Amino acid sequence: MIFALLFFAAIAIGWVASMVGVGGGIFMVPLLVFLNSVSTTQEAVGTSLAAIVFNSISSTIAYSRQKKIDYKFALALLPMALVGAWLGAFLTEFISSDALAIAFGVLLLYVSGLMLAGKEPKELGLLLRRGLDPHGNPKPILGALVGLVAGVAAGFFGIGGGIVMVPAMNIFLGVDIVNAVATSLFVMGPSSLIAAVTHFFQGNLHIDLALPLALGIIIGAQLGAWSTTRVSKIFLRRLFGVVLLYSAVNMIWKGVQGVL
């Protein structure tokens, strides 16, 4: 029963996650906790990370066929994203995350509003033009910066890097929303794999739960990538805005609970 439930839920999660460039952990972790399938939140995180690896692989295959992945920019993002993830996790030992979670959540609320507006990056007037080359493509140095910020946020707050990477690439660097989604999903593969392996050796990864999630998310990711060719870019921005709004409210709520 639980196998089938997680499998079909993962198809839906993978479908949405692949369309907006996130791993899907923001949905899988609360699902596993709600179903009482795990004893701790860390076990839910570790198990969901294993599925996220397969979301990245499946999405990368689909988006590479569409030629939507900016590999040059991704290679600038990836190393600093890994460094940032380590740095973020390291900082949790010294800095209370509750107050910062509230502040970061408020920032995400603002960004979600920008995405929900559905406007083109140029219409928002927030493009960092000095960070673009003569052809309008983002410079690698900005890719490294985006990767670092996304990595630190992921390591410190336990959120997916796509929550930072997609809006940063689309709103501030003018990268096409589908390209931003595809590149984000490609980048999160290696970092999710490292995190999943770490959780496995810590005993936080349940193979029996990760298997149906992975199988479902592989299918969902293919459906999500296919769907991006059937919907408007305004719809994609607004869909991401909804996902981001959910993440922001969830982060603020957890921060408030920690403070109180």
PLM regions and their residue ranges:
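Alpha-helical transmembrane segments of polytopic integral membrane proteins
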Residues: 25, 29, 54-57, 109, ...
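Juxtamembrane transmembrane-helix boundary motif
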Residues: 1-16, 29, 33-41, 61-153, ...
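Short hydrophobic/aromatic, small-residue-rich stretches within specific transmembrane helices
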Residues: 48-52, 184-188, 209-214
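Conserved N-terminal glycine/acidic-rich loop preference
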Residues: 6-13, 17-22, 27, 49-56
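Membrane-embedded alpha-helical segments of transport systems
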Residues: 50-58, 83-84, 187-194
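Hydrophobic, membrane-facing alpha-helical anchors
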Residues: 1-6, 49-61, 134-135, 159-168
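Transmembrane helix boundary and interhelical junction motifs in multipass membrane proteins
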Residues: 20-31, 158-168
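Small-residue hotspots at the loop-to-helix junctions and early N-terminal turns
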Residues: 41-45, 181, 185
